[in-house]
Amino acid sequence: MVSNQRVRLFMLCFCLVNNAVIAATEDENVERKPYIVYMGEATENSLVEAAENHHNLLMTVIGDESKARELKIYSYGKNINGFVARLFPHEAEKLSREEGVVSVFKNTQRQLHTTRSWDFLGLVESKYKRSVGIESNIIVGVLDTGIDVESPSFNDKGVGPPPAKWKGKCVTGNNFTRCNNKVIGAKYFHIQSEGLPDGEGDTAADHDGHGTHTSSTIAGVSVSSASLFGIANGTARGGVPSARIAAYKVCWDSGCTDMDMLAAFDEAISDGVDIISISIGGASLPFFEDPIAIGAFHAMKRGILTTCSAGNNGPGLFTVSNLAPWVMTVAANSLDRKFETVVKLGNGLTASGISLNGFNPRKKMYPLTSGSLASNLSAGGYGEPSTCEPGTLGEDKVMGKVVYCEAGREEGGNGGQGQDHVVRSLKGAGVIVQLLEPTDMATSTLIAGSYVFFEDGTKITEYINSTKNPQAVIFKTKTTKMLAPSISSFSARGPQRISPNILKPDISAPGLNILAAYSKLASVTGYPDDNRRTLFSIMSGTSMACPHAAAAAAYVKSFHPDWSPAAIKSALMTTATPMRIKGNEAELSYGSGQINPRRAIHPGLVYDITEDAYLRFLCKEGYNSTSIGLLTGDNSNNTTKKEYNCENIKRGLGSDGLNYPSLHKQVNSTEAKVSEVFYRTVTNVGYGPSTYVARVWAPKGLRVEVVPKVMSFERPKEKRNFKVVIDGVWDETMKGIVSASVEWDDSRGHLVRSPILLFRSDNDYR
């Protein structure tokens, strides 16, 4: 008996020592990294008490009080409960098992999703209905690269003082000395401040231009004669020019970190913003490990809608980011204009390229060469001169000439890999870059430049090789008309894998070649040696689409200040304009369609979603009761609150478990039949009695039934329930993506449309 006890004691000691040795070995090989410890809803304790509680929790894992204080970087505590600390992986894992912790995840770097757009959307200046008094009380928080408050787009002439509800601050710093009555607040977040370029730290000033661009798209005042070096000349303005901007700088030269974004959300919610716009994204993660999903949930609890960019990794499927159903995820579509940069060859042939070339030619023709002919590499030298790689061309062969560069062959290569910088450094006169694939996105060039389609590039090569004295000229970019809207090639597509039965993106907005304000601290091309500065610039990305949707949300809120975030989002989705696009991606690329702000202020019916409904959805998605309780504060130390329990949630919530404005289902690849039921509740936001009749559009082979088919309302705020039953057989004609729709029509101008999309990934759906 004694012998067995000794053996057990020995084995216990051995395991403890062995685990300690393993941990020590890990510590030697792994550097401590910042982790975010998310603990749900903030308690009613003071920030000082919250920070001390975080320290005590960390100390239980670290085992040393002074070391714990050294390792803790930051505490959240205004609306979001949690902290950031430098941890080893095994310490993070141990913390994740502690009572009161929802999740522990590594701090990562995320990236920005980088004029006439409001006219294109129907908000023609002086010709659309506005509620200016209420609009001026709306505050949009922009989480981005900061702001240039000196831009004419943020002139506060005639603008009254900030709304009384505003609780934020203007934090001044280098190159940022003041706010005004338009930009009423500015803060910067860089919890780990090392590694910043000189002059960029400790300031909300925008050294990139991105934040100034997005902010002015939302609420910039009207500025006439705005252009980028004469390109796209016209009037620049925001969608809600009387609204206020609060700038939260979370993105720096190195990127945008999770911990900084979460800190900005915590501040913005407390400051009193009404809408949050964040054009940032990264890898898709479970909601409790996604800082944007976490921050947006806490914002939603305070009545704040968060608009997010869908991402720029298109056109492939499963590329969309920002997937939480409580955020509005925005795809990018085109305007009815494009930028054309014509190249003319010495033999009279022309090629229509794309760029933002603000240089007028000084000669009728320039000598033309190619990267291959301008090579300075000896036999066996490293590099590819045909694509104009740095270090492969000779100055004596480039000086004063236009250089043609073939398309790069790297994965995803599409030209534009700095060839303009290479050619300018060798005193070249211009650059023509061949594209592997067509693009709709125009970019600024350091010298005269144009990006031409692959076939045109081949003809240019043939011309160069056919004559002893090839010549070419690159004309200044001009604006031409095009059919629109269409989804931009870069815009990320669904479906998604985190919550497979929620359709993302939700909606689309202009994001291609958008003219808006720019920072005087940022170069036009992003090259450090580009000394040109401009008050306005043209940028593309879902980053540019997101602020259009944020402004549209603010516009709707100016007419309906008491509406919930979900109601505003529903109004924009159900009144959106469906799009026709090439291929079979359908709603996976544009969601419900392009925003139509004028229709959205009178949607007729809305699909509202409460906080409790989102919690039921999280239960259905498999998140545990304890974590959900912490998210809401129901599992806090407050003894008057009951613990949240998913077991008490009513079952039979339908195919998606949420009162979402769109209907989506990812079908198992082995299933030949489709059989789904969606339950929905609509709220009447129209005036007077009304009757709505359901209209269904569905392809052959798919039966879509709405029960009941008629709904009547006597007064505003009345609710009605209905269900949508979908049955069919998945045959070859349906391919992998099937689109349908349900529309509720009251014959008085209200048409409430919900797209239906079924997806099965085993087919060739392209």
UniProtKB/Swiss-Prot annotation:
GO biological process: proteolysis
Compartment(s) of residence: Secreted
Domain of life: Eukaryota
Domain Inhibitor I9 residues, every copy: 35-113
Key words of the record: Autocatalytic cleavage, Glycoprotein, Hydrolase, Protease, Secreted, Serine protease, Signal, Zymogen
Intrachain S-S bonds: none
Signal sequence range: 1-23
Keyword Hydrolase: yes
Principal subcellular localization: secreted
Post-translational note: The C-terminal propeptide is autocleaved.
EC number from the UniProt entry: 3.4.21.-
Record-annotated Peptidase S8 domain positions: 117-601
Protein family: Belongs to the peptidase S8 family.
Name of the protein: Subtilisin-like protease SBT4.15
